[in-house]
Amino acid sequence: MAQVVAVCISEKKGERKTPVDAVELRENHGIVGDAHAGDWHRQVSLLAQESIDKMVALGLDVTAGDFAENITTSGIDLVNLPVGTRLQVGETLLEVTQIGKECHTRCAIFYQAGDCVMPKEGIFARVINGGVIKPGDGIKIVMI
């Protein structure tokens, strides 16, 4: 079963996010208290634990939030979800708006490993219905 492994926030853009016990998502805004929240298409970022594990296999000491993702998942193939897919995550509803992103500046992880998974395997979403998400919550595809 697909589920949430961790939820993470940061006060500033361009930094690693810190795992927290739960996050509150606000409709058409994102995660309350997170630097990336706002009226745009990348309100929430998701990255699979399986993607993080690829970097661990390269010898990096990385964990949830180190790639600046808000929601770390397991058991769902995020990168192959079409834009427009809706996901029920805990009590919230998210709509996938973007797969991957352009990496304008090479981050510390890129220089350490020569690669980074977030630009290729991270996805972004906007909040359709708000609520709370916490580790252990289920993830369901409700519309493709």
Regions found by a protein language model. Give the residues of each.
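Metal-cofactor-dependent catalytic cores
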Residues: 1-144
